[in-house]
């Protein structure tokens, strides 16, 4: 039995948010959790309270992709629903690549997870005393719980409040993880290197949990926040972790497309409640591509919009279609989607009188660090949870509102971690502190090079590995990214930091230290993530789920397998049956 479902609501005095200048960073924890979205927060809460836990986030605990999640969290709790139906829908959406055992575990644990969240104080919407359930695309039943259209914010706010009340959890904000710290003889993960307070330090841990979210910022069009730079996947890959299914990226069909506006996600729940997807003539064109129309799986709807614009728009790259909410009763719109109404109003759109301009954008990464049902990776002592992990649940295409659920169900597995599971390390003395120095003009030139790379890379990846891909553009993009990786490695800061020995601290004394070192680290991570996605997309010579190739437009039974990569080696691996 999994004990986390009876998580107590702790009532310790609420501490202030701590800045790095206010704390003394310990040199060792029992467990380090990197990332403070839903996966990281819930993992930290579920870890035994006897363990000393460090929760590391490069921003604040109030900023993550989970906080942006609108639609909700799926669970089969209705009388006419069941985990078996939830399993069927998830497998159907996954286009033949779901690991059945992982899907069964997810759906069967979902109702108890909802009970746990309610007990912790998450205020889901209700109809009277009953939890309100809505329908989303590719679900056969109303099973999506929500808190208006800001479910992610409600979940993360509640979890953050609980985390800050736990005396065994120390939250370290604005600290940037740079690399894993492996024991050279055993290959065990014994901690991380990270940047904080203008210095690089090494922190030991009996276990490291990566919960850093996705990598949407590698694409020019994305619904992800700026923090989503694929840090966990890149860090794990460089350390030798096995990664899985990196070519599968979910492009959300309906992101707000307005000059000057962020690509704000218009939740799938809007279409589930009855909104229509129409073209400039007001025609519901999605039915040309799938019998379910705008309620087809996300990859189908995204390609429908892409194909329709390619055929009808003068400039498909900047064109859009329309999402018309007017078929939904006005009172329901105000009740269910107040944030969407508010954001659209901010950009001059009255959803009660006119449709919303929308187009697809990168939204969710199905691939990630390969894990088992206990979140273990191939590196002893290293775990991964949430979007940064590949559990086998989503297959080639994630079912709507299964992402928050995955964070909670698999984060809960860390409740079973015991002191006996923690890697015991031999203490080694820290090496003398090195100082990074650079000429002012050279530093300015380096800043300019990083900024140019950061601007060019997402455009290249969007054009070559976006909704539709083919070998010719992938090959050119791979060669370009390799060249940029070489340019990045030749930077003075790269040469200095990549030459560090384990447990060798660094002090940095140059202007804008925090901002510039973060730019350096994120740019390096995005270059690696781009390379991995491009190579994985070229490796899979078929179309399936979130991976569509113009030169191989159909699924191939020989490719009903996972793609795995370790370092620079790619290979196929069979899916896991129940």
Curated annotation (Swiss-Prot):
Subcellular location, principal: cytoplasm
Family of this protein: Belongs to the FAD-dependent oxidoreductase 2 family. NadB subfamily.
Co-factor binding details: Binds 1 FAD per subunit.
Gene Ontology CC terms, in alphabetical order: cytoplasm
Cofactor(s) in the UniProt record: FAD
Protein name as it appears in the record: L-aspartate oxidase
Chain positions recorded as FAD binding sites: 36-39, 58, 65-72, 231, 387, 403-404
Domain of life: Bacteria
Site feature location: Important in orienting the L-aspartate substrate: 136
InterPro entries cross-referenced by the UniProt entry: FAD-dep_OxRdtase_2_FAD-bd, FAD/NAD-bd_sf, Fum_R/Succ_DH_flav-like_C_sf, Fum_Rdtase/Succ_DH_flav-like_C, NadB, Succ_DH/fumarate_Rdtase_cat_sf
Localization, UniProt: Cytoplasm
Gene Ontology MF annotations: L-aspartate oxidase activity; nucleotide binding; steroid dehydrogenase activity, acting on the CH-CH group of donors
Known catalytic reactions: L-aspartate + O2 = iminosuccinate + H2O2
UniProt cross-references to NCBIfam families, sorted A to Z: nadB (TIGR00551), PRK07395.1 (NF005636)
Pathway assignment: Cofactor biosynthesis; NAD(+) biosynthesis; iminoaspartate from L-aspartate (oxidase route): step 1/1
Residues at the active site: 298
Keywords, ordered alphabetically: Cytoplasm, FAD, Flavoprotein, Nucleotide-binding, Oxidoreductase, Pyridine nucleotide biosynthesis
Top EC category: oxidoreductase
Enzyme Commission code(s) on record: 1.4.3.16
Known function: Catalyzes the oxidation of L-aspartate to iminoaspartate, the first step in the de novo biosynthesis of NAD(+).
GO BP: any one term: 'de novo' NAD biosynthetic process from L-aspartate
């Amino acid at each position: 039995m999994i004990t986390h479902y009876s998580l107590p609501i702790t009532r310790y005095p609420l501490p202030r948010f701590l800045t790095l200048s206010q704390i003394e960073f310990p040199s060792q924890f029992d467990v380090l959790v990197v990332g403070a979205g839903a996966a990281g927060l819930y993992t930290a809460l579920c870890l035994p309270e006897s363990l000393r836990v460090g929760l590391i986030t490069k921003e604040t605990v109030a900023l993550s992709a989970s906080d942006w999640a609108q639609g909700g969290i799926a669970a089969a709790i209705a009388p006419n629903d069941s985990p078996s139906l939830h399993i069927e829908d998830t497998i159907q959406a996954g286009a033949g690549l779901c690991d059945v055992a992982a899907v069964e575990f997810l759906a069967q644990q979902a109702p108890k997870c909802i009970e746990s969240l309610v007990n912790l104080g998450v205020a889901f919407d209700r109809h009277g005393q009953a939890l309100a359930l809505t329908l989303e695309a590719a679900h056969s039943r109303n099973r999506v719980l929500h808190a208006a259209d800001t479910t992610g914010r409600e979940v993360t706010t509640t979890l953050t409040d609980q985390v800050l009340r736990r005396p065994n959890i120390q939250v370290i904000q604005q600290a940037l993880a740079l690399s894993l710290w492996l024991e050279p003889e055993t290959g065990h993960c014994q901690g991380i290197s990270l940047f904080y307070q203008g210095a690089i330090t090494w922190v030991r841990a009996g276990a490291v949990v990566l919960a850093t979210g996705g990598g949407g910022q590698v694409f020019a069009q994305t619904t992800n926040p700026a923090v989503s730079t694929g840090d966990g996947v890149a860090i794990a890959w460089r350390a030798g972790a096995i990664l899985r299914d990196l070519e599968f990226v979910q492009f959300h069909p309906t992101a707000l497309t307005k000059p000057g506006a962020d690509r704000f996600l218009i939740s799938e729940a809007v279409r589930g409640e009855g909104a229509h997807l129409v073209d400039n003539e007001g025609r519901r064109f999605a039915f040309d591509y799938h019998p379910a129309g705008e309620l087809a799986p996300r990859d189908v709807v995204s390609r429908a919009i892409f194909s329709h614009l390619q055929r009808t728009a003068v400039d498909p790259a900047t064109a859009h279609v329309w999402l018309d909410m007017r078929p939904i009763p006005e009172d329901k719109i105000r009740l269910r989607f107040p944030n969407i109404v508010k954001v659209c109003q901010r950009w001059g759109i009255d959803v009660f009188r006119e449709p919303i301009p929308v187009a697809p954008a990168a939204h969710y990464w199905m691939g990630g660090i390969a894990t088992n049902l206990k979140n273990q990776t191939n590196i002893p002592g290293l775990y991964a949870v949430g979007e940064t992990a590949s559990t086998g649940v989503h297959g080639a295409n994630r079912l709507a509102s299964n992402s928050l659920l995955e964070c909670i169900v698999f984060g809960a597995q860390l409740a079973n971690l015991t002191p006996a599971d923690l890697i015991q390390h031999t203490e080694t003395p820290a090496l003398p502190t090195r100082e990074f120095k650079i000429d002012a003009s050279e530093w300015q030139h380096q800043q300019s090079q990083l900024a140019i790379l950061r601007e060019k890379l997402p455009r290249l990846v969007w054009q070559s590995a976006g909704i539709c891909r083919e070998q010719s553009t992938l090959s050119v993009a791979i060669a370009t990214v390799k060249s940029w990786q070489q340019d990045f490695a030749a930077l003075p800061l790269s040469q200095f930091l990549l030459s560090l020995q384990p447990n060798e601290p660094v002090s940095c004394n140059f202007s804008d230290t925090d901002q510039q070192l973060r730019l350096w680290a994120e740019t390096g991570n995005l270059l690696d993530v781009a390379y991995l996605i491009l190579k994985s997309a070229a490796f899979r010579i078929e179309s399936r789920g979130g991976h569509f190739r113009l030169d191989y437009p159909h699924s191939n039974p020989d490719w009903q397998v996972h793609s795995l990569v370790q370092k620079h080696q790619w290979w196929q691996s069979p899916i896991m049956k129940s």
